[in-house]
A protein has these predicted regions:
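Acidic interaction surfaces
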Residues: 1-143
């Protein structure tokens, strides 16, 4: 029995180290975007849907947006004209290099293997806003 709990303890330590490193990489990617692009804020929601047509409801990242305005939070109903959904990054606004940096972060955030870390680190049913000042977390209603 002791062997099992030693193994479980080792697993939890490794998981914790992985989570810390993964969040550090995400925060560093965000920092680089702020330093090397015109992006001033990054926003996303993350939650487990309440209902999914009978399929299993799984935690996911949703609504990733970037803004060239300095915002402390995003209002999804009142997006500024300088706020862009990541699926529609305008090459007239963003350079190929900027789009590449943003896309690299998006790939990390949308990787299903990192979902558990994001849920543990930031929560479920939340909206995340990242600015140069840091990351803020608000409750998010997604009915």
């Amino acid at each position: 029995m002791d062997e099992f709990y030693e193994l479980l303890n080792e697993y939890n330590k490794t998981k914790s180290i992985f989570s810390e490193k993964a969040i550090s990489i995400i925060k560093n990617s965000i920092k680089i975007i702020f330093e090397k692009t015109q992006v001033k804020a990054i926003y996303w929601t993350q939650y487990t849907p309440y209902f999914n047509d009978g399929e299993e409801c799984t935690f996911e990242i949703h609504s990733i947006l970037v803004s060239t305005d300095t915002l402390s939070t995003f209002d999804e109903d009142e997006k500024s004209s300088n706020t862009y959904a990541i699926d529609y990054l305008d090459s007239k606004v963003f350079s190929d290099y900027e789009i590449e940096l943003i896309s690299n972060l998006v790939r990390i955030l949308q990787d299903e293997d990192i979902a558990e870390v994001l849920k543990f680190s930031f929560g479920d049913h939340v909206a995340i806003t990242a600015t140069e000042e840091g990351i803020s977390i608000q409750d998010h209603n997604h009915y």
